[in-house]
Amino acid sequence: MSTPTPDGWLPTTVQTLLDRAGDDVARLEVALLAAWRPTTLLAHADLPGCVLRWHHQMTKRANSLLVLGPTLPRSTALATSWYARRAPAQAPLAMTRCPLPQGPDRGAVLIMTCDLAQFPAAGQATGAQRPDQPQETPSPAPSPTRAPALWETSPSTTSSPCSSPVSPAPWEAGPRGPGRQGPRLHLGSRLPRVLLERTAARGMGTPDDVARARALLLCAPGQVFATVSQGGEVVGVARLAVTGVNDVAVLDGVWVAPRSRRRGTASHMIRHLAHQARHLGARHLALEVEADNLGAIACYERLGMGLHHAHRYTPLAPWGT
């Protein structure tokens, strides 16, 4: 049994938090936590329904007080003091529930979900787009001989990644010249360097940033990474975290190079990762997206994802107030 620190903080676990979650929103937040689990998770008897997250200031998601209940506790001085001792120059934050925004809201984060049984199959078109949505042409279904093989059934294995040609129709306008290669989708358990570097760049600029980024990206019980490359250059990456919490898999780290956007790249990666999630036993897919990222929201909606709830990062009251 863990011993509390002198100021009363006690290490906690994802399972303990799940056992104490009071509603569907809290349970989904625990699944999101399992997908992006920091090195330090602490609970305090005087802050019921809260968990203090710390990962050396790398991302707000891993360095804020997660409030699982419907409201912020009346006093959060204990958390403010804890963060102030470790990061005095950084304003401590709490992540709290908020009403679903009615439009673009720079401070809100939307949590979107879907039932994987209803998710479009890899390569399946997703229907007409609304005129106000960014035009992203879905990829047609690949031929059976080129479909990617399934990843290993155990998320803890280090299987050999699989590779498949991405359908060239929406991505390769014009004739193919000598030596020109179309984009290829690569799925596997190996962490893409591009994703590691992009995450490490969100640290404090110290030599430990790469190791801390790797710890976050490999923290879930299982991960599947998607990489799209073209001409020897990575033009898209995404991560699927198999959380082991209520059959939820979490999608994050979706990035597409500017020159490859609006060509179906993100949708193609997401469909294939959703297929892997189902194969690994997940029944639900969840993700977080900032409420003012209208292009990403439109892409996820076309794939059948809907709003579940919203949260926002709220500054904690200064210590002593």
Segments (PLM) and residue ranges:
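A conserved beta-strand-loop-helix scaffold within acyl/acetyltransferase catalytic domains
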Residues: A215-G231, V235-W255
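N-terminal charged segments
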Residues: M1-R86
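Conserved acetyl-CoA-binding loop-helix of GNAT-fold acetyltransferases
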Residues: P73-T80, G253-V256, R262-H275, H279, ...
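Conserved GNAT acetyl-CoA-binding A-motif
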Residues: R86-T96, A277-E288
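A short helix-loop-beta-strand connector motif used in the catalytic cores of GNAT acetyltransferases and
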Residues: R37-A43, A87-Q90, G107-V109, L216-A226, ...
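Acyl-donor-binding surface of acyltransferase catalytic domains
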Residues: L68-P138, P142, E152, S164, ...
